């Protein structure tokens, strides 16, 4: 009889382990992976899909199974081990009153140890590491158990919902829990630290989060740096100009940059030139879209995709041209700098010279500088480090140094209030 009871104890521990493994596995498994297995014809995947589609109900089934086996183990385990150990401790000569206490304590420790280690911790570890295999293996038995205990599960869930409502709360299902952006960033950081994703993946996803908060003004090519073609130029003059500038698309202006009429693609100009066609620039000019400089980058990209236009002109609040944005500028916000064969000699946007020591393009965003140097430059009206430096001192030239925010800002290249490059060193730590 004692042997049968010991066997029953280990069976209960085994059943507990199955429910614990099932609980962690169905939470851990990815729905996309299950869908792939369904497409490959795995019948077990259909059962697993049914479970993760009704996750709350099946988690309740797991919890009910764990509770039932735990109660059975508590009812059978300690008395059985106590009867098994009592004769052994009697042989040691321990007086009977103390013998009973010692036997009870040791039996309780043994049952607790077996339950926690074999019934909880070990299956949890296995199911987290092998969530897919465990989910497929346990899916059909768990569905059978759910069907058998369905009335109890419904009664327990209903009672729990009624109880929490009495205290003014609402029951929330697992699939209704929303993860915030900050929580996603923390999960991403932990995955990167554990080596589950590489540095490029970590950087791309972070940039996607930041992308949603960007406005076009922050990534534009400013008005002063726009290479344009005048409508009055001949085809030959325009071609000579694009050979020097080496861009693909150019805004076409009339009189000045506040009057942009359209865009010309260099391919169209070369085609017309080599065919010997006597045409004017307005005949090969394409339409251009104009948007306010504060438009979110995401909205601008959608519009450019919809209208199949690669360049947009940004307009300031007074109606003048503020700058332009290309599709490449937008994509670079996610994937980083894109360089072609004509960009070989360009200085990187941000060049690290040492610890807390950088050389930056004047168009570098203040947010980027703050993140790199762990400082807090604040100016809601200014986007770039060059703009902020001009608020500190309007007449800046190459070689000038400004000390602010615990950093040294040295102007490396500037002309007519246009700061091209600045060297920044953090001096206060």
From Swiss-Prot:
<dbReference type="InterPro" id="IPR002550">
    <property type="entry name" value="CNNM"/>
</dbReference>
<dbReference type="InterPro" id="IPR016169">
    <property type="entry name" value="FAD-bd_PCMH_sub2"/>
</dbReference>
<dbReference type="InterPro" id="IPR036318">
    <property type="entry name" value="FAD-bd_PCMH-like_sf"/>
</dbReference>
<dbReference type="GO" id="GO:0005886">
    <property type="term" value="C:plasma membrane"/>
</dbReference>
<keyword id="KW-0129">CBS domain</keyword>
<keyword id="KW-0812">Transmembrane</keyword>
<feature type="transmembrane region" description="Helical">
    <location>
        <begin position="1"/>
        <end position="21"/>
    </location>
</feature>
<dbReference type="InterPro" id="IPR046342">
    <property type="entry name" value="CBS_dom_sf"/>
</dbReference>
<keyword id="KW-0472">Membrane</keyword>
<feature type="transmembrane region" description="Helical">
    <location>
        <begin position="61"/>
        <end position="81"/>
    </location>
</feature>
<feature type="transmembrane region" description="Helical">
    <location>
        <begin position="133"/>
        <end position="153"/>
    </location>
</feature>
<dbReference type="Pfam" id="PF03471">
    <property type="entry name" value="CorC_HlyC"/>
</dbReference>
<dbReference type="InterPro" id="IPR051676">
    <property type="entry name" value="UPF0053_domain"/>
</dbReference>
<protein>
    <recommendedName>
        <fullName>UPF0053 protein YugS</fullName>
    </recommendedName>
</protein>
<keyword id="KW-0677">Repeat</keyword>
<dbReference type="Pfam" id="PF01595">
    <property type="entry name" value="CNNM"/>
</dbReference>
<feature type="domain" description="CNNM transmembrane">
    <location>
        <begin position="1"/>
        <end position="201"/>
    </location>
</feature>
<keyword id="KW-1133">Transmembrane helix</keyword>
<feature type="transmembrane region" description="Helical">
    <location>
        <begin position="101"/>
        <end position="121"/>
    </location>
</feature>
<dbReference type="InterPro" id="IPR005170">
    <property type="entry name" value="Transptr-assoc_dom"/>
</dbReference>
<dbReference type="InterPro" id="IPR044751">
    <property type="entry name" value="Ion_transp-like_CBS"/>
</dbReference>
<comment type="similarity">
    <text>Belongs to the UPF0053 family.</text>
</comment>
<feature type="domain" description="CBS 2">
    <location>
        <begin position="284"/>
        <end position="341"/>
    </location>
</feature>
<dbReference type="InterPro" id="IPR000644">
    <property type="entry name" value="CBS_dom"/>
</dbReference>
<dbReference type="Pfam" id="PF00571">
    <property type="entry name" value="CBS"/>
</dbReference>
<keyword id="KW-1003">Cell membrane</keyword>
<dbReference type="GO" id="GO:0050660">
    <property type="term" value="F:flavin adenine dinucleotide binding"/>
</dbReference>
<feature type="domain" description="CBS 1">
    <location>
        <begin position="220"/>
        <end position="281"/>
    </location>
</feature>
């Amino acid at each position: 009889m004692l042997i049968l009871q010991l066997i029953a104890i280990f069976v209960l521990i085994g059943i507990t382990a199955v429910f614990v493994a099932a609980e962690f596995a169905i939470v851990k498994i990815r729905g996309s992976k299950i869908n792939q297995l369904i497409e490959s014809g795995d019948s077990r995947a259909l059962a697993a899909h049914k479970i993760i589609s009704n996750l709350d109900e099946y988690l309740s089934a797991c919890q009910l199974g764990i509770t039932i086996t735990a109660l059975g183990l508590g009812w059978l385990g300690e008395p059985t081990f106590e009867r098994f150990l009592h004769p052994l401790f009697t042989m040691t000569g321990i007086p009977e009153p103390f013998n009973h206490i010692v036997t009870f304590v040791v039996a309780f420790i043994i049952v607790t140890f077996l339950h926690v280690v074999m019934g909880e911790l070990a299956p949890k570890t296995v199911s987290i590491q092998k969530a897919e295999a465990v989910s497929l293996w346990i899916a059909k038995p768990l569905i059978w158990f759910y069907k058998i205990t369905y009335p109890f599960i419904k009664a327990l869930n209903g009672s729990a919902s009624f109880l929490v409502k009495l205290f003014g709360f609402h029951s929330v299902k697992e699939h209704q829990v929303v993860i915030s952006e900050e929580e996603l960033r923390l999960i991403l950081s932990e995955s990167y630290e554990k080596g589950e994703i590489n540095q490029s993946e970590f950087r791309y996803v972070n940039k996607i989060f930041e992308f949603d908060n960007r406005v076009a003004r922050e990534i534009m090519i400013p008005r002063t740096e726009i290479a344009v073609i005048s409508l009055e130029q001949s085809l030959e003059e325009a071609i000579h100009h694009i050979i020097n500038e080496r861009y693909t698309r150019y805004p076409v202006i009339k009189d000045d940059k506040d009057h942009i009429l359209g865009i010309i693609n260099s391919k169209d100009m070369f085609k017309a030139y080599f065919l010997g066609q006597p045409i004017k620039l307005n005949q090969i000019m394409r339409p251009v879209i104009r948007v306010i400089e504060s438009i979110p980058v995401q909205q601008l990209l959608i519009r450019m995709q919809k209208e199949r236009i690669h360049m947009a002109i940004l307009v300031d609040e007074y109606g003048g041209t503020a700058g332009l944005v290309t599709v490449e500028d937008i994509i670079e916000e996610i994937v980083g700098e894109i360089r072609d064969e004509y960009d070989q000699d360009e200085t990187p946007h941000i060049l690290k010279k040492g610890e807390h020591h950088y050389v930056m393009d004047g168009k570098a965003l203040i947010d980027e500088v703050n993140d790199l140097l762990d400082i807090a430059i604040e100016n809601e009206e200014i986007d770039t480090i060059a703009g902020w430096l001009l608020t500190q001192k309007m007449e800046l030239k190459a070689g000038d140094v400004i000390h602010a925010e615990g950093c040294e800002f040295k102007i490396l290249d500037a002309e007519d209030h246009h700061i091209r490059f600045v060297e920044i060193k953090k001096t206060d730590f």
